[in-house]
Amino acid sequence: MLENSRGAHESGPRLHPRFSWGTTLLVSLVMLLPCVWQSRIQSIDLSSHIYNAWLASLIAQNQAPGLWLAHQANNVLFDLLLAGLLPYFGAAATQQIAVGLAVLVFSWGAILLISHRRPQNWWFVLPSVAALSYGFIFQVGFFNFYLGLGICFWYLALFFSGRWQKRLLITPLLALAWLAHPLPVLWAAGLALYTAVAERVPAPARLPLAGVAVVVLLGVHFWLRVAYHGVWSIDQAWFATGANQLLLFDRKYSVPYALLLAAWVMMLWGLVKERRLRAIVGDLMFQRWLLAAAAVSMIPAIITFPQYALPLSFVTSRLSLGAGVLLAALLAQVQPKRGEKVVLTLSALIFFGFVFRDAQKLNRIEDQLDVVVAQLPRNSRVIGFLRIPSKPIPPLLHAVDRACIGHCFSYASYEPSSRQFRVRVAEGSPIVMADYDDVASVETGEYVVKAGDLPVFLVYLCGPDRQQVCSHQLREGEVIDSVASVHEPE
């Protein structure tokens, strides 16, 4: 049923009446399974996050010359969680606990937001949420953003169903989410503002109101491109469904992506037949997804803020995750047919099968990396160049960070020089590069070793299939990529 024209509020976040605490626990355990099914969680930036949590502990003990902790109001919540857990649980368990908590916050926030209209639609909700929870944003390890977005899902689920008293009471959730990352808060605040205004206008006036909101987004688009050198492409519109979260590191992921998208299209067609297009377009839930899709399409994918050495990147992929959950909230109003249930289930099973197999391969390489790093002198400076040729985004980009914990220093760790995180570096630190341009050159393999870097070791993929790990003590004037092209161990 559509909302009333004025002052209507949607039903509150609720689960199926038979969805007991036991079932809630079971679903939570299933959601957490990918956090414990391998020896390590494979997520690109996670290695950097846990390593810098270890650096933060060294800073607190005055054992990290040239490093210091910045006091900042955002992009720190996940890092604070890691830093708080690390002294008590060690690096391995800390990663599993912190990531597991983030997954539960995100997945249950998404479930409540998707299910607030039709709580009994579990055949649709669970496969969709599971896949989105472990999609691209999880795999690249943007956990401050991920955690912040999960908190914002809880906020929106409560906001959409509450009157002004409840809406005021839940405002602190936005402050907590801001501590994680500002982008989800701006996204959620925009949706909440639109909802609050739309509820107070007649239903026929809501679509023009959405048009005004799109024009505002267009203004933001041009402002970011001019003021902050935003990089934008028309291709961003392809990300509006959020199904692209299933497209990971190679072409095989196009199979679960296509299946999920097909199931969603079939359900959308069923919703159109059940509700009629005009009724759907006038629905607040559709308009929220429309605005989220417009943000995906219009907000530049890369934004350069002057206070940071590293641009805010993958903005389109980040926003598409929220758009995917809002589209799922719209589609959850129709019960999937048997064929759609099969396609949704197949999509999730194939996706997680691929994720498991890829994580297994990466962990085998990381096992070798641990052995090689352990053989290097204690407190050595180490550079990692672990590019897998067939992967457009290197999944082991920061793996040497994790391998160095407690033994060595990842000399090209990107967080301190980026100025986006709380661990910062001063010029001349013996622990990590202070210039982000040097770090970026290391990642591309173009860096030329300087006298001031020595002594420093390189660990890199070697062997005919690039599945082995080798080490080399670098010399002044050597180029990272040239050394890494040697396939045989020294």
For the regions a protein language model found, what residue spans apply to each?
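Transmembrane catalytic cores of multi-pass membrane glycosyltransferases
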Residues: 35-48, 62-63, 70, 74-75, ...
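Short hydrophobic/aromatic helix or loop-helix immediately within or flanking a transmembrane segment
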Residues: 51-55, 68-91
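Transmembrane-helix motifs of polytopic, lipid-linked glycan transferases
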Residues: 97-118
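Short acidic/glycine- and proline-prone juxtamembrane loop motifs at membrane-interface regions
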Residues: 138-147
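Membrane-interface transmembrane helices that cradle and orient dolichyl/undecaprenyl
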Residues: 152-168
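Hydrophobic/aromatic-rich transmembrane helices and adjacent perimembrane loops
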Residues: 309-336
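Signature aromatic-anchored transmembrane alpha helix within multi-pass, membrane-resident enzymes
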Residues: 333-357
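Short periplasmic/luminal acceptor-recognition loop of GT-C membrane glycosyltransferases, typified by
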Residues: 362-365, 372-464
